[in-house]
Amino acid sequence: MKKQFTGIVLCSTFAVAGWSLQAKAEEPKEYRSNGLVEFIPNVDPTEPVDPENPDPEKPVKPIDPTDPEGPNPGTQGPLSIDYASSFDFGKNRISNKDQVYFARAQQYQENQKETPNFVQISDNRGTNSGWSLTVTQKEQFKATKATLNSQLTGAQISLANPTVNSNAQNVVKPEATNKIALVPGTASLVAAAKQGTGAGTWATYWGKVEVVAERDETNTVHN
């Protein structure tokens, strides 16, 4: 089983054994040998894990509702964004009133249970120098085909009730922003790890999964 080490580049020697040899009626002789170990930053990609029960030994396969060929692979390097959910707000009737729509839960291949939508970060640099994660909505929602009202003016995505989770032991958790209201073109802070914190793999998820009866504009009920 492959083990991944989190640590700064380190070359260290230490005594591992004291060898003794003694003949009858003679003084014992000693010879000391040493051990050598080296740790380097882990640059292997980190697969997504269940945000509610993160275990790197049990990776998951999330589904991207916006891309049948997705999801996109995680970023490269020892400090990486491993995964971020795409949001699916379903089909909704046009209304002239303000409406609130909730994103569907994160789904997975192989019939795994649904989870809240989440983003996953891994810090395998070994420096414990901290990090910050921001999100930017590139532009306002708009139709795939040009129409008179092709842009959803005034719509806003909100992320609330975050939970930061990891299987890392004896490590201080990063801090997540309690509520985020996205503004197109503007970066919003999602989570940050101060100096000396944030090492390992961390999932930040929002809210909890609720089972509801959902009716879209085609009158199809989803449970």
Q: Which positions does each model-derived feature cover?
A:
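Signature of Gram-negative chaperone-usher
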Residues: 4-7, 21-223
